[in-house]
Amino acid sequence: MSGSSLRIVVPALLVIVGSVPVSLPAHAADGTIVVQRQVQPRVAYRPSMVPDPHPTVVDTNVSAEVNALANGAASGNTVSRELGDADFAIVTSGSGIRSMILTGSALPGFASQPANPATVQAVGNLGTTHGAGGGAGAGLAGQINGSLKQGLAPLQMLGGGQ
């Protein structure tokens, strides 16, 4: 081949070889995340000084902890199996508490008439009737309304008592 044909063939060959996709296997790193690192000041055109020898890092690779738990070696645990149906069967949704909270389709303390005077007395002033107000609900509502009126009194004074 002559020199002029080599000048044409070699770049064409490089373009062909460069355009062929090369698929190398991608490997994940160990999962270390650098949270904080001391960055040393330097002049822009000089190479950096020594990097921080002790950066604050977080290792997200938890395989050692997971394997230790699965084998029962971490802190005396005996977890060496997967969770089964029996493990999930003992979990409750809290629906049983509904019967304890709702007594006669009303929330305790908000009934119009207190069911048990001893219970009302144990609660305190909430159950005492105030005029025609009713039971514990009216007492609680009266306390809330009184607190709101007291808190809004400065604004009412600014508005001329309206």
Curated annotation (Swiss-Prot):
The keyword Protein biosynthesis does not apply. Keywords: Chaperone, Periplasm, Signal. Transmembrane segments: none annotated. It is found in: Periplasm. Disruption phenotype: Both a single fapA deletion and deletion of the entire fapA-fapF six-gene locus show no visible growth phenotype and no change in biofilm formation. It comes from the Bacteria. One of its GO terms (biological process) is amyloid fibril formation. Induction: Constitutively transcribed with a peak during mid-exponential phase; maximum transcripts are seen under 37 degrees Celsius and at 200-500 mM NaCl. The first gene in the probable fapA-fapF operon. Its main location: periplasm. The keyword Cytoplasm does not apply. Residues 1-28 form the signal peptide. One of its GO terms (cellular component) is periplasmic space. An intrinsically disordered chaperone for fibril amyloid FapC that guards against fibrillation within the periplasm. Upon overexpression of the endogenous six-gene locus (fapA-fapF), cells form large clumps during liquid growth, make large amounts of biofilm and produce amyloid fibrils. Belongs to the FapA family. Monomer in solution. Interacts with FapC but not FapB in vitro. This is Functional amyloid chaperone FapA. It comes from Pseudomonas aeruginosa (strain ATCC 15692 / DSM 22644 / CIP 104116 / JCM 14847 / LMG 12228 / 1C / PRS 101 / PAO1). The lineage of its organism: Bacteria, Pseudomonadati, Pseudomonadota, Gammaproteobacteria, Pseudomonadales.
